[in-house]
Amino acid sequence: MTEDKAEKVMPEETAFEEIEKDFQEVLSELSGDKSLEKFRTEYEKLHSIMKKSYENEKRLMAKCRELNAEIVVNSAKVATALKLSQDDQTTIASLKKEIEKAWKMVDSAYDKEQKAKETILALKEEIVNLTKLVEQGSGLSMDQDSNIRDLLKFKEEVTKERDQLLSEVVKLRENLAQTIEKQQAAEHAKEEAEMAISQFQQEIQHRQNEASRESRKKEKLEKELRQIQTDMDGRQAEIKAMQQYMHKSKEELQRLEQQLKEQKILNERAAKEVEQFQMRNAKLQQENDQHTLTCEQLSQENQQKALELKAKEDEIHQMRLDLGKLNKIREQIHKKLHQLDDQKAEVEQQKDTLKNQILGLEREVESSKKQAELDKKAMEELLRERDILNKNMLKAVSATQKQVDLVKLHEQAKKNLEEEIQNYKDEAQKQRKIIFQLEKERDRYINEASDLTQRVLANMEDIKVREIQIFDYRKKIAESETKLKQQQNLYEAVRSDRNLYSKNLVEAQDEITEMKRKLKIMTHQVDQLKEEISAKEAALVKLHLEQQRIEKEKETLKAELQKLRQQALETKHFIEKQEVEERKLLRIIAEADGERVRQKKELDQVISERDILGSQLVRRNDELALLYEKIKIQQSVLNKGETQYNQRVEDMRILKLEIKKLRREKGILARSVANVEELRQELYHMQREFLKERTRCRALEEELENPMNVHRWRKLEASDPSTFELIQKIHTLQKRLISKTEEVVEKELLLQEKEKLYVELKHILARQPGPEAAEQLQIYRHTLREKTKQLKVLSSELNMYESQSQEYKYEIERLGNELMSLKKKYLAQKRKELVLKNKDRMSMNNIFSETKKSVPRFTGGGFPLHQATKVKF
């Protein structure tokens, strides 16, 4: 692995050195030219930034390697923790099942106990009533004696049932205590495992965050480096373009200089020709004194020609100066144009980037606005629904709070546990994925290590050293089975050994390279070494596999030992909790025994009082017989009134519930229902009925409190309801009860739906953007305003530069046109001069020929040849 890293680092360093060389070459090229001084400084800045980014990249790579090593260590710890958490979850599930069974048994026992208590209370009330009657003074009838005996028997049976139920409750409580202790022990173990997992997760998260930060820094630096390289490439391209332009301008200057030289040569030739003409004129003047007039004319013409030549030379000189000025102006214009082009390109780039940024920001702003509007609408709708739901929830909860509290608690605990289990499953799935990736990396690294070992096997001495180290390793593994506490130190030792092995591998590679150089000398030893190496390689592979197997066994033993320790701790906590629960149960049993003794005393007291009352009742039997009949009649009347009163109270309660229901339905359906008036009328009728029932109840209460029967001594007549009426009433009550149970089920379903809606509302509200999003939006708006201002400034500058460039273009075109017109004038002048020269030559030739013809020629004795000799005879 280290060799691969070294091989990766080497080409990067070589590439960096090549870039450094290129930079130095470019600097040496740019240092001679002063016009590119700014570019050279920019280039140096880019190079310094690239150097810094390269150094930061090196540092980040080293940090990434360290973080990867720590992640591997933490992943192993997480794997062990996940195994423990999975075992804990199975135990928790089994304990939950046992607890649910125990709770069911406890609930049934509690119901039985409540029924028994109710019967005891009813009996006590009857006893109190009887004692009151006895105190009023009269004897009991036979029916009453039989009733009392039946009641006493029933009480004894009830007490027996209560004792049985108490014993069952004690047993169930013991079972419950055991299961609770088991559950608490499992929960304690689960909490410890969760703590360990959370610690490992925090460490892994911390490491991952650091790695992600470093990777982001690295990516940022790589982007900057790429940007710098692209800038450098662009600057180099600009330099090349400038050099090409300079080369072209030099060629243009050389061409113009060549033209000037040719022009000079032509002027010199013309001057020489003028001198020749002057010489000829002088000779002609010397030879032709007779033709002075013609010579004077010719001299005048020559003087005129000389003046014209001087004027032409002055014009040529002026044209040369103008050309020099024009060249300078052209160079300045070219420089300005290049500067403007560069500035324009930079401005266009900035403009494009700013446009892209503005477009991106506008899109983000639009999307955020749309999202904000949608969120606002959703929030308003959800707030409305939440208000409605809150109202409904408050109304529903006020009606069924006592019955639902326990169910809610149990369901909440169940949901929390299920959510925790689901979270643990998700986290375990994530950790499994991470472990799977890490195992892949580990396998890759193992393959790389095996490849490296195969390379290293060429050296015999290193193999012997490794065999010794493997032997030591085995000893260490054997010791680790007895001393599992020192596993971490051994692990660190193995890591250091691995690092040593990697160093040894590097050294062995160096030695291999040296041995390769000596291969030409040691060819006869190579075959023997190859055979020995193959044997040693096979042995080393076996040893490597054996080592892997031993490491796996070591890890399993470590996990088992950790598991056993945790189980021991769990059992210890379980025993402690059992003892605490046992103490609680003993205290409860003692309280129950005290209650039983107290009730027994009360029963004995009641029996003694009964005996006393029996003796008193025998004496007062006659008086009580008369009173009993009256009491019976009054009691039946009272019972009827009480039943009617209870019915009215129940009707009132039902009506109240119905009113609440109607109000709730009215609140929910107020927007969609059109027949509001009908509902109001119904509500009004219901209220009237309710008021009627209330007045009726009040009248009944007043009648009970202030009976209208003045003559107490008269016998009251009454008739018990028939069995058919009672059966009908029972049927109606059963129907009512069924309907009420159905309503309760519907209410529970509604409550569940409302709870679901409430949870969804909570989640939606949690997902809604908070004040931070508004602050970010404000920041984005502020930045958008600044960017728009900058864009306006840049656009105005761009327009100014464009107008300047247009002016410069027009100036260049004008100068080019002037230059072309000057060239045309110059060529026309040259042509005129050539034509005049040709004419002068022709005229001179004609003059010479005419002078030669007109002058007399003498030959021999000096007689003229063209005159005829007149001879006289």
Curated annotation (Swiss-Prot):
Localization: Cell projection, Cilium; Cell projection, Cilium, Flagellum; Cytoplasm, Cytoskeleton, Microtubule organizing center, Centrosome
Location (main, coarse): other
Alphabetized Pfam families for the sequence: CFAP58_CC
Region of interest called Disordered, as start-end residue ranges on this chain: 202-221
Annotated keywords: Cell projection, Cilium, Cilium biogenesis/degradation, Coiled coil, Cytoplasm, Cytoskeleton, Flagellum
Summary of the knockout phenotype: Male mice are infertile with severely decreased sperm motility and abnormal sperm flagellar morphology.
Description of how the protein assembles with itself and partners: Interacts with ODFP2.
Signal peptide: none
Protein name per UniProt: Cilia- and flagella-associated protein 58
Encoding gene, per UniProt annotation: Cfap58
The family this protein is said to belong to: Belongs to the CFAP58 family.
Superkingdom of the source species: Eukaryota
Function (record text): Has an essential role in the assembly and organization of the sperm flagellar axoneme. Required for the elongation of the primary cilium and sperm flagellar midpiece via modulation of the Notch signaling pathway.
Gene Ontology BP annotations: cilium assembly; flagellated sperm motility; Notch signaling pathway; protein localization to motile cilium; sperm axoneme assembly; sperm flagellum assembly; sperm mitochondrial sheath assembly
InterPro entries given in the database record: CFAP58_CC
Disulphides: none
Tissue: Predominantly expressed in the testis. Also found at lower levels in ciliated cells and tissues such as neural progenitor cells and oviducts.
Basic and acidic residues biased stretches: 204-221
Coiled coil, from the record: 106-609, 642-832
GO cellular component: centrosome; cytoplasm; sperm flagellum; sperm midpiece
